[in-house]
């Protein structure tokens, strides 16, 4: 005898009761799935975005986590700034001498290699200058090396590309050093695009706007990273904005930059006037990364943080205990849902005793009747679980734009957490256990007594 159609007909016969029980279970599952999915997506995104092609972030001495959140995720305020001379410590003697010639500064800086240069092994160094905003979005002053060297995507192998326009140039014939590239979310939120001019505000989203604007020359394709929420401008243009030049000490030795006679471009800041907020580092040989980090930590006023390590510590310290709380919520919610299944089926047993007695009189065994009741529990759990999963993920899709805008995380219908796939079997198992009490009641149904009713 095929018991599944019988259990399904019983489920459909009591349509209202079955619907309410299934809906209650579905809403419970939807709540749990939503919490687990958001937790899993955010955790995965934080860890994934901690590695976008570099392995160290260098900045002023202080909290490594704050440095990571500020430089990688654009979520925290900068600690302080580093002198441009600290940035030069990663370069060879020839490169340092060229910087002195190009910008102007103490000639002694160009007579030696930087103290960290030997640890680079042919890697790359990318400066970041932060502090300005465009609306609620961070303005990031950097060089063309940012887009040339960094990658994104699940395998960190996808270069930055433009949905519209192009990446900024070091010195454009028409725009000079005042070019900007917008993250995808910035362009959507601020309603600007290629050909427009954007004027950053100094130090605060509500601060005073700079008189000098940047020509928008490109809009990045969405990357699913915090870079979607940033505005990237030429570092040299960033330095030339009002209030960005550091006062030169009276005892500083500054030789002027070497300029062509017919060069009518703006005079760039000298080395003592320059500062960087953070430096992104990738060693050519990753074996040197721990050595470089240790070497930097030996110096005063500067630190090197490994973004992945900092984020993992954050997850262990905050998200770890949170996951235990989420597990407790999951267990309680699933238990309540199972109790709902038990109550619904058990309350229907009085109305079904005659039906059960008829089945027994027609030759059905006690085990057969018991199995039908358990199958009803299984149907309610399976249907409710699947509907709840679908409701939760549909909600995530609806809220996807808000989540991406706030966190830079792209959410799809099938974005799931590692614990989520264990939820449905767990709910089904609990519902089967809950079905044993009404099934036992059906097992003990007296045939003669209920047929005479």
Give short role names for the model-derived ranges:
Residues 333-340, 346, 350-400, 422, ...:
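Transmembrane alpha-helical interface segments in multi-pass membrane proteins
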Residues 23-25, 323-344:
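Internal alpha-helical transmembrane segments of multipass membrane proteins
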Residues 36-149, 268, 294, 302:
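Hydrophobic, regular-secondary-structure patches
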Residues 386-426, 436-449:
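Short helix-loop junctions at transmembrane helix boundaries
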Residues 3-12:
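A short amphipathic helical element positioned immediately N-terminal to and/or at the very start
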Residues 17-41:
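Short, strongly hydrophobic transmembrane alpha-helices
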Residues 94, 204, 208-215, 219-323:
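Mechanotransmission and gating elements of multispan inner-membrane complexes involved in transport
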Residues 128-129, 133-145, 153-254:
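Hydrophobic secondary-structure segments that place a key small or acidic residue at a functional site
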């Amino acid at each position: 005898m095929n018991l599944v159609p019988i259990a399904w007909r019983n489920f459909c016969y009591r349509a209202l009761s079955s619907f309410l029980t299934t809906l209650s279970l579905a809403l419970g599952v939807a709540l749990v799935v939503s919490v687990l999915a958001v937790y899993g997506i955010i955790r995965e995104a934080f860890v994934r975005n901690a590695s976008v092609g570099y392995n160290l972030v260098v900045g002023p001495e202080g909290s490594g986590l704050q440095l990571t959140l500020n430089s990688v995720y654009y979520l925290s305020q900068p600690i302080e700034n580093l002198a441009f001379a600290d940035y030069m410590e990663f370069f060879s003697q020839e490169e340092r001498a060229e910087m002195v010639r190009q910008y102007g500064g103490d000639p002694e800086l160009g007579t030696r290699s930087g103290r960290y240069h030997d640890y680079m092994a042919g890697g790359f160094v990318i400066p970041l200058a932060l502090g300005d905003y465009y609306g609620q979005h961070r303005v990031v002053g950097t060089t063309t090396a940012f887009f040339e060297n960094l990658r994104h995507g699940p395998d960190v192998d996808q270069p930055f590309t433009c949905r519209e326009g192009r990446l900024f140039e070091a010195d454009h014939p028409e725009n000079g050093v005042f070019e900007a590239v917008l993250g995808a979310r910035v362009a959507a939120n601020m309603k600007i695009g290629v050909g427009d001019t954007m004027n950053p505000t100094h130090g605060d989203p509500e601060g005073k706007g700079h008189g000098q604007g940047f020509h928008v020359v490109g809009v990045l394709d969405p990357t699913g990273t915090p870079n979607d929420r940033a505005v990237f401008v030429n570092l040299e243009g960033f330095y030339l904005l009002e209030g960005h030049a550091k006062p030169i000490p009276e005892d500083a030795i500054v030789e002027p930059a070497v300029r062509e006679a017919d060069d009518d471009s703006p005079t760039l800041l000298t080395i003592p006037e320059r500062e960087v907020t953070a430096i992104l580092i990738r060693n050519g040989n990753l074996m040197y990364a721990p050595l470089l980090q240790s070497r930097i930590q030996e110096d005063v006023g500067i630190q090197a943080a490994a973004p992945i390590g900092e984020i993992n510590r954050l997850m262990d310290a905050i998200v770890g205990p949170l996951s235990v709380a989420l597990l407790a919520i999951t267990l309680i919610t699933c238990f309540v849902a199972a109790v709902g299944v038990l109550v619904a089926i058990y309350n229907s047993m009085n109305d079904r005793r005659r039906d059960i007695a008829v089945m027994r009189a027609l030759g059905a065994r006690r085990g057969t009747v018991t199995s039908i009741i358990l199958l009803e529990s299984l149907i309610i759990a399976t249907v409710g679980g699947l509907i709840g999963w679908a409701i939760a993920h549909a909600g995530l899709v609806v809220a996807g734009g808000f989540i991406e805008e706030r966190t830079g995380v792209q959410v799809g219908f099938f974005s799931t957490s590692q614990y989520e796939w264990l939820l449905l079997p767990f709910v089904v198992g609990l519902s089967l256990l809950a079905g044993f009490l009404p099934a036992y009641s059906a097992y003990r149904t007296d045939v003669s007594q209920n047929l005479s009713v």
